[in-house]
Amino acid sequence: MQLNPSEISELIKSRISELGVDSQVRNEGTVISVTDGICRVHGLSGVMQGEMLEFPNNTIGLALNLERDSVGAVVLGEYTHIKEGDPVKCTGRILEVPVGPELLGRVVSVLGQPIDGKGPINTKLTDFIEKVAPGVIARQSVSQPVQTGLKAIDAMVPIGRGQRELIIGDRQTGKTAVAVDAIINQKGKGVYCVYVAIGQKASTIANVVRKLTENGAIDYTIVVAASASESAAMQYLSAYAGCTMGEYFRDRGEDALIVYDDLTKQAVAYRQISLLLRRPPGREAYPGDVFYLHSRLLERAARVNAEYVEKFTNGAVKGKTGSLTALPIIETQAGDVSAFVPTNVISITDGQIFLETDLFNAGVRPAINAGISVSRVGGTAQTKVIKKLSGGIRTDLAQYRELAAFAQFASDLDEATRKQLERGRRVTELCKQAQYKPLQVWEMAASLYAVNNGFFDDLEVKNVLAFEKGLQDHLKSKYADLVARIEATKDLSKDDEAALRAAVEDYKRSASF
C-alpha cells in the first residue's frame, strides 16, 4: 500500500483543527504555609502589590509582601479550609467595594455586604478601596461650617466642610458620643454621613445604630462595621472602605462626613498583620509605614473645587464643590498624647478636640479641654452669628482653669480675680450639654449672647442650665420671628441684637427659672 504524504499531512491538519484546545496563560502559585490568616504562596511571579488573589472555595486574599521566592498574602475571611499545596490564582484586579446612595440607611460589612437583615443592596457602581487623594490644584479652601450642635465645639473649635478634626481622649470620655451627636445634627442639612466602627464590640455598634435610628439619622448614614470578632485584615481595610463610600458623594458635588471609630484599633490591626508578615518592627512594635497608613487615609478628606467635580462627572454637575469631612477618633492611655499613633494623627489632622477624664468625672460633658483643643481652620468656617458671639468664651475658660488652679492656694483674692472665677464657673456650666440633644444655631446664639452680656453673672451656678432652657422656650413661644430670622440668615444684625437683648431682659424679669 502506497502512502501519499500530502494526504497524511491533510489528515493530521484536520485532526488538529478538530481538537479545539484553548490554551490559557494563567499566573498561578501554590500555598506553602497558612498561619493566623497569613498565607505564604510560592510562584505568582507577576503579582502586583495589593492585588486580589483567588484561593479555593472563592476565598479572596490580598498580596501585601512581594519577596524574591514567595508572596505574603492576607486572607479576607475564613482561612481554615486552606491547606499547603492548594492552588492560588492572580485576578489582575484591585479590591473594590460597592458605592452609591443605595447604601444609605444600611449597616454593611467591610466589603459592602449587608449585615442588618434588611435584604440585599442593589448598588450600580463599585470603586477602588485604595485611591490617591485629590491634588493641591483640585482643592478649595474650607469656608463652610459643619455644625455639630455642641456649644463647646461650635463656639471654640469650629469644624469646616472638608476639614480633618481629631477627637482624642482616654477610654470612656465620650469620644463616640461627640461623633454621634455630630451625625445626628446633620439632619436636613444635606450632609451624608459614614460611621466606620473598627474593632468595637458588636453590642456597642448595635447601640450606636439604635441611637441613630431613634433620632432619624440612619436615613442619611452608612454604617461600616468591622467588629472585634472580625479578622485583623478586615479591621485594617474598614477605614479605606468607608472612605471610598464617602468619596462617592464628595466627587459628585455633595457634602459628606465620615467618622473613624477608632484609628488606634486600626493601627493595632495593621501592626498585627505586619508582624505576622515578618516586617521589621519599629517604635512600640509598629511597622515603619504606620504614619503613611493614616496619612493616605486622612488626606482623602478634602473640599474639592467645582472644576474637579465637573471633570469627574463629565459635565453633569456644574458649579458645585464637594467635600468629605473626617472625624478620626484616637484613644489614649492615661492621657498620653505623646505616644506614637496619637502624635502621628495630631500632625496629620487640622486640629484636635481633646477630651479629659477629670472633666468627664466632674460632670462637664462633653469633657472638652478648651486650653489644648484647637481647630486650625478656625473662624473662616464658622457661622457668622456664632463667630460674632463666641470670641470671649475660649479665653474666659482658659483663664478660669489657670486661676482656679492658683486660687486653691490663695486665701484672699481681689475682686477682679473673684469675678473672673465666678464667670468661668458659669461659662463651664453653660458648656455642659445632654447627649443626643444637639442645638440649633439660634439656640446657641441666644445662650452665647446671654453669657457674653452678663445675664448669667447674678445667677447661681446650678440654675444656669435651667435659665438657658427657659430662655429657649421663651424665645420660641414669644419671639418666633426673631428665631426664624437668626436661623435663616445665620447672622445677628443690629436690630436683631437689640430685639434679642430685649427678649432676654424680658425673660429675666419674669424670673420663671
Swiss-Prot record:
It is found in: Cell inner membrane. The record marks S373 as: Required for activity. One of its GO terms (cellular component) is plasma membrane. It is a peripheral membrane protein. Its EC number is 7.1.2.2. It catalyses: ATP + H2O + 4 H(+)(in) = ADP + phosphate + 5 H(+)(out). Its main location: membrane. ATP binds at G169, D170, R171, Q172, T173, G174, K175, T176. InterPro entries: ATP_synth_asu-like_sf (IPR023366), ATP_synth_asu_C (IPR000793), ATP_synth_asu_C_sf (IPR038376), ATP_synth_F1_a_nt-bd_dom (IPR033732), ATP_synth_F1_asu (IPR005294), ATPase_a/bsu_AS (IPR020003), ATPase_F1/V1/A1_a/bsu_N (IPR004100), ATPase_F1/V1/A1_a/bsu_N_sf (IPR036121). The keyword Ion transport applies. CDD domains: ATP-synt_F1_alpha_C, ATP-synt_F1_alpha_N, F1-ATPase_alpha_CD. Keywords: ATP synthesis, ATP-binding, Cell inner membrane, Cell membrane, CF(1), Hydrogen ion transport, Ion transport, Membrane, Nucleotide-binding, Translocase, Transport. One of its GO terms (molecular function) is proton-transporting ATP synthase activity, rotational mechanism. It comes from the Bacteria. It is an enzyme of class 7 (translocase). Belongs to the ATPase alpha/beta chains family. F-type ATPases have 2 components, CF(1) - the catalytic core - and CF(0) - the membrane proton channel. CF(1) has five subunits: alpha(3), beta(3), gamma(1), delta(1), epsilon(1). CF(0) has three main subunits: a(1), b(2) and c(9-12). The alpha and beta chains form an alternating ring which encloses part of the gamma chain. CF(1) is attached to CF(0) by a central stalk formed by the gamma and epsilon chains, while a peripheral stalk is formed by the delta and b chains. Produces ATP from ADP in the presence of a proton gradient across the membrane. The alpha chain is a regulatory subunit. This is ATP synthase subunit alpha. It comes from Polynucleobacter necessarius subsp. necessarius (strain STIR1). The lineage of its organism: Bacteria, Pseudomonadati, Pseudomonadota, Betaproteobacteria, Burkholderiales.
